Amino acid sequence: MKRFFENLFSQTERSVLNTGKKVGAGIAAGEWKNTEWGYPIATQEVIFLAKVFQPQHVKRHPYHIVRGTIAPLAVTLPLAFFVLNYFGVISSKIGFVIALSSFIGGLTIWAISIVFDSLYDQQHTYEVKRGLVMGMMMFIISEIMFFFSFFWSYFYISLSPNIAIGCVWPPYGLTVYSYMGLPLLNTVLLLLSGAILTDGYTILTEQKAVHENNEKVIAVEEAFTNLMNLYTKKQSINTLTFVDERREKFFAKNDQNAEKKEIAISAGVKELRDLDWDLYFFENPQNMEPNYKAPTDLSVIEYALITIFLKKRNKVIKTRLYFTLVCAVVFLFCQGYEYYFAPFSMNDGIYGSLFFLLTGFHGFHVLVGSILIGIITIRFIVGNFDLLNVGTKFQIFKNKSTGFACTLFYWHFVDIVWIFLYIVIYWWGSR
């Protein structure tokens, strides 16, 4: 068992995961500083190292080997159905609902498999993360080329309208949307969502608890700073690292037999409960019981500080993710409302075709971006980001938030495309 943990901690690309077992305090999950995988403490839980999820196989190369999955078929077959349905080859409302559900489910399965390979199977090395980011960048560039061709068509006909449409743009007799109203609201929604999502990612990568300078946050930050200084001091004066020292202490206390381990678990839970009481009395001194003795074990205080910090930080980030999702859903609703009550249709000449093609293609990208943001939100809820050190925003290939970063890139791409759409179609095209 000891050799297993020595091998486990020697691999810097590994991150210890939460197994959902509350086993008390006094457990060192890893060095919070100078490691790639940070400090893996899950919200309201302490990590039990003996139950760490082990990878299914050892990866002896840095390259990306994917496992078999039905996700690509679940995504591409609905796209083929949408094309056939558009041209009238297949016409079925039930089939459309099934295809849309399959598309969303396929993207979800795909995302889950990527998360599994990254966190649970530990297959995402530096090269793999770089490949994922570069793949997202190439995908965004290809989508830019798509929109470039559509905008080219729009400018080709609008800058030199022919006699078939009355030599004017928009075509004579066609009622078009004003750049005020719903288009302006959609612009505000997308820009606001991009700013909120960026702020959430900044909080995650810069390890901020919250922006507001209230007394509780300041107290937590001061205590956290003192704890970090203590770690640094202990590491500098001891031959063993703080992690090794704490791990050895844990095994000395808890690796004797099952009965002693259960006793240690109960004691740890009791210490945490006592700490909760101590925090309560700190905020309500008038209720302090006489001769009350607060816990002084560093591991208990360590656990409490980490838990408070992660709870505050992740709560703020999840709130921003919720707001981003709300903005995206409202945008899609407004777009659908605009389509339903549009004074023209796709069959009303070149203007209607280009309008619905450009805005509809963008709306599809908003839907995909909403799914990606929803997946990141679910990952926050289940505790995938309950790490202190996820890396900075300038360490995309090394940090533990590569998926969040790629989602942020994609959402900014959606924002920028909409700004061009708003200026070209709604503002310039309606003048």
Swiss-Prot record:
Database matches in InterPro entries: Cyt_c/ubiquinol_Oxase_su3, Cyt_c_oxase_su3_dom, Cyt_c_oxidase-like_su3, Cyt_c_oxidase_su3-like_sf, Cyt_c_oxidase_su3_a-hlx
Keyword Transmembrane belongs to the record: yes
Family membership noted in the UniProt record: Belongs to the cytochrome c oxidase subunit 3 family.
Keywords in alphabetical order: Membrane, Mitochondrion, Mitochondrion inner membrane, Translocase, Transmembrane, Transmembrane helix
Pfam families: COX3 (PF00510)
Membrane-spanning ranges: 70-90, 96-116, 132-152, 176-196, 321-341, 356-376, 408-428
Biological processes per GO annotation: mitochondrial electron transport, cytochrome c to oxygen
Domain of life: Eukaryota
Its biological purpose: Component of the cytochrome c oxidase, the last enzyme in the mitochondrial electron transport chain which drives oxidative phosphorylation. The respiratory chain contains 3 multisubunit complexes succinate dehydrogenase (complex II, CII), ubiquinol-cytochrome c oxidoreductase (cytochrome b-c1 complex, complex III, CIII) and cytochrome c oxidase (complex IV, CIV), that cooperate to transfer electrons derived from NADH and succinate to molecular oxygen, creating an electrochemical gradient over the inner membrane that drives transmembrane transport and the ATP synthase.
Molecular function in Gene Ontology: cytochrome-c oxidase activity
Protein name: Cytochrome c oxidase subunit 3
Lineage of origin: Eukaryota, Amoebozoa, Evosea, Eumycetozoa, Dictyostelia
